[in-house]
Every structure is written in structure tokens, then in C-alpha cells.
Design a protein with these regions (language model features):
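Primarily membrane-embedded glycan-assembly and transfer machineries that use lipid-linked glycans
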Residues: 2-156, 160-162, 187-309, 317, ...
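Short amphipathic alpha-helix initiation/capping segments at coil-to-helix junctions
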Residues: 304, 308-313, 328-335
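Aromatic-enriched
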Residues: 322-410
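Transmembrane helices and adjacent periplasmic/lumenal helix-loop junctions
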Residues: 165-186, 305-312
């Protein structure tokens, strides 16, 4: 096994060196938007959590004020982060060594999922790691990296007890991973599945009950976590995109038109996947299948419900192993994979041009602005495709359960 992954380990070292060179030479500012943060300051999203822990120790309500943070940003995550024990004399561990370790683990896990001797997989792996979402998540050391590692471990784990712990921590940290509780009912004996699924929801309801006041405070500061145009991974990005569409279509008509198109695309992909065998016989005994299903749920939910910064796109990785494994079994799956690769290339180039072309060159900048506005349309198409597949898997599973119940009755 290790011999087969020898090239992967060499590639891990290569990627980590390249990332270090990019960030140490401040080349990242032409690849990711700094969001009012100094180009010499790294791990800004993690720093605000550490500063909140410090201020909480000093007696501040960090959900309302956080003078310990350089930019006075409040705490907008679950209070579980504030339970992290902090020792001032080990500040370098919290602010430097821990982020570097997690980033190295993140990069390693990504690369080890690919067969780098295959050209398509090598290209996709490289594009994903150096994509604007991944670079932004790494540059800011956003805690989505921690959630990513918790959930990918939960998909890999065979223990519902372990999964219960991992998913609970992820949910208490960022809230949206609550949908990944579906993992708890995918495998195991019926009693075991019911017990841990029920225990999770009872625990989370109790947590939200005691956390309610803090959640209200978090939403008072929603400007800190709601992404602006160009930085968003959300259907809302289409409604504010700067393109010729806004000139010819009013906002309300654009919303209606977008929702109709989304429904139409979802229906098409739902219908197209009806006769695909791998979805007809879909089960959760396979790690890639579990990862794919959880990835579908998280990406679809975040896209249609929340207004996320585009580093949330790192969870699209969850669908890659399944698509790669089955790309030769069905042309639709293969085309979706190629579309994802094309989308990565387009986003990288358009984002680079957007960040490097001077605003003073208005005619050129205006055209690039329109170019960037194409990306939300690509997002819509991709998420609608994944939504159709998700609905098809759910429909097939429901049909399978109904047949089993009918068989038991007879």
C-alpha cells in the first residue's frame, strides 16, 4: 500500500514547499482576496478565535465585544471553541504549530485520495489544492478545515460512537454540520443506528437550548460571516452578480428566473440518473459512497440555504473520489467530472485576473468583472446536478426500503 502511494508522499512534500514559498513571498495576494487583512498576516480566522479565548478569560462577552482582537472582531462560532484551554507561554503552539500541523494533514489527506499516476486525477488534485477556496481556507486557517477533517474521519470510521463524538463537535463548532448526522443511520444494526442518531439529536437540542442567547448575538454580527459578491458560494451570488443580466432583468425577476432554472436543472439530472446502476444499488458499506452522500448534503444545503465565503467549496472534495472511481461506468458522471475540472480552471484564471488587473484600467477591469460573474452560473449548474443525484439516491433508497417492508409483510 505504501509503495503504491510513494509518489503521493513525494507530491505532499512538493505541495507543502510550494505553498510555503507562495505565502512566505506574499504571492498569495494575487490568488486570494485578503478581505481587509494585512498581506503579512496569516491565519486571521484562527487568530480571532484565540483572541476571543483570551478576552473570555478576562471576563468579556466575546459574542458582543472582543478588544483582544486586532480588528475587534467578535466571536461568531460555537462556544465550544471558547472551551479550548489556553496558556500564554505556549502561544506559538496555538498560533503557529497547530495551524501548520492541521494544514499539513489537510493537504496530505487530499493528495492520498488520488492516484497521481493518472493524468485526470493529478490535474484535479492540483487544481483543487491551488484553487482560490482551498488557498483562502489555508491562508486564513478557517475552522472549516477542522470540520472537514472531523467529517472525513467520521465517513471513514466504522464506529457510531466515534462518529457521534466527531459530528457533535463539528456541529457545536459551526452548526451546519448537523446535516452530517445522517452518517449515524447509514451503517450498523438497527438499534445501534437508532440509539446514536437519537442521542445526537437530543444532545444537540440541549446544546442549542443553552446556546440560544449566544446564537442570537452571533446573528447580530452576521456581517462578519456573510460573504459579499465575488467571495460567495451561494445561490444568492447570482442575485447580486455584476453582469449584463442586471441591466436587462430586475432583481425580483432574476430571482424567479434563477429558481425556475434551478428546478428545471435538478429535474433533468434527477431524471437522467434514473437508470444508472450505481445509484440503483447504492449502499453505504463503501467509504467513497458515504463520503459522496455526505458531500452532496453539505454542499447542497450550504449553497441553497446560507451565504458562505467560497472556502466552503472545499467540501466539494467529498464527491470527487466517487466520481473518479465511477467515471468509466457512466458518461454523465464522466461529464460532471470534466465540468468540475473546467470550472476549477475557469475560477482560477478569472479570479487571478480579477485580483491582478488594476481597477484604474476601468474598461479592462469592467470586462473581467463580467468574466468573474460567470462563476456563479457555473456554481448553479454544478449544485443543481449534485442536487438531482442526491434526490435520485434518496428516492432509490426509499423505494428499496418500501420493497423490503412489503416483502416482510408478505
Amino acid at each position: 500500500m505504501l509503495k503504491d502511494k510513494k509518489f503521493n508522499f513525494l507530491f505532499i512534500i512538493f505541495v507543502l514547499i510550494v505553498l510555503q514559498l507562495i505565502f512566505s513571498n506574499n504571492q498569495h495576494h494575487s490568488l486570494v482576496y485578503l478581505m481587509n487583512i494585512s498581506q503579512n498576516e496569516f491565519f486571521a480566522d484562527w487568530n480571532v478565535i484565540i483572541s476571543a479565548i483570551k478576552c473570555k478569560i478576562s471576563g468579556f462577552d466575546v459574542f458582543l465585544e472582543n478588544p483582544c482582537d486586532k480588528y475587534r472582531r467578535t466571536h461568531v462560532y460555537g462556544s465550544i471553541f471558547l472551551k479550548i484551554p489556553f496558556f500564554e507561554k505556549y502561544s506559538n503552539f496555538y498560533l503557529i504549530y497547530f495551524p501548520y500541523t492541521i494544514i499539513s494533514v489537510f493537504i496530505s489527506i487530499i493528495i492520498l485520495h488520488f492516484n497521481l499516476k493518472n493524468a485526470i486525477e493529478l490535474i484535479l488534485c492540483t487544481l483543487f489544492i491551488f484553487s482560490p477556496p482551498s488557498l483562502l481556507a489555508v491562508e486564513r486557517f478557517n475552522n472549516d478545515l477542522l470540520v472537514f477533517l472531523l467529517l472525513i474521519t467520521a465517513c471513514y470510521s466504522r464506529s457510531n460512537f466515534t462518529n457521534f463524538i466527531l459530528i457533535s463537535f463539528a456541529t457545536m463548532a459551526k452548526f451546519y454540520p448537523i446535516v452530517s448526522s445522517i452518517i449515524l443511520i447509514l451503517r450498523g444494526k438497527n438499534f445501534n443506528r437508532f440509539f446514536y442518531f437519537s442521542l445526537f439529536w437530543v444532545s444537540i437540542i440541549i446544546f442549542f437550548y443553552y446556546e440560544l442567547n449566544n446564537i442570537k448575538k452571533i446573528f447580530l454580527m452576521k456581517d462578519q460571516f456573510i460573504a459579499s459578491w465575488g467571495m460567495s458560494f451561494s445561490i444568492n451570488n447570482i442575485f447580486v452578480l455584476s453582469s449584463p443580466l442586471q441591466i436587462s432583468i430586475s432583481r425580483i425577476n432574476l430571482i424567479i428566473f434563477t429558481l425556475i432554472v434551478a428546478f428545471f436543472l435538478i429535474f433533468i439530472f434527477f431524471s437522467k440518473t434514473k437508470k444508472i446502476k450505481i445509484f440503483q444499488s447504492y449502499d453505504f458499506n463503501n467509504y467513497q459512497n458515504r463520503l459522496f452522500f455526505v458531500g452532496l448534503i453539505i454542499c447542497v444545503l450550504n449553497y441553497f440555504v446560507f451565504t458562505n465565503y467560497f472556502y466552503r467549496e472545499i467540501f466539494l472534495f467529498f464527491v470527487y473520489p466517487f466520481l473518479i472511481t465511477n467515471k468509466n461506468n457512466n458518461i454523465l458522471i464522466r461529464n460532471i467530472l470534466y465540468f468540475i475540472i473546467g470550472r476549477h480552471i475557469f475560477f482560477f484564471i478569472s479570479n487571478y485576473l480579477y485580483l491582478t488587473v488594476s481597477v484604474k484600467s476601468y474598461p479592462v477591469f469592467s470586462k473581467i468583472n463580467y468574466l468573474v460573474s460567470i462563476k456563479p452560473l457555473l456554481d448553479l449548474f454544478l449544485i443543481c446536478a449534485l442536487s438531482g443525484i442526491l434526490l435520485r439516491i434518496c428516492a432509490n433508497l426509499l423505494e428499496k426500503i418500501m420493497k423490503e417492508k412489503k416483502y416482510e409483510v408478505n
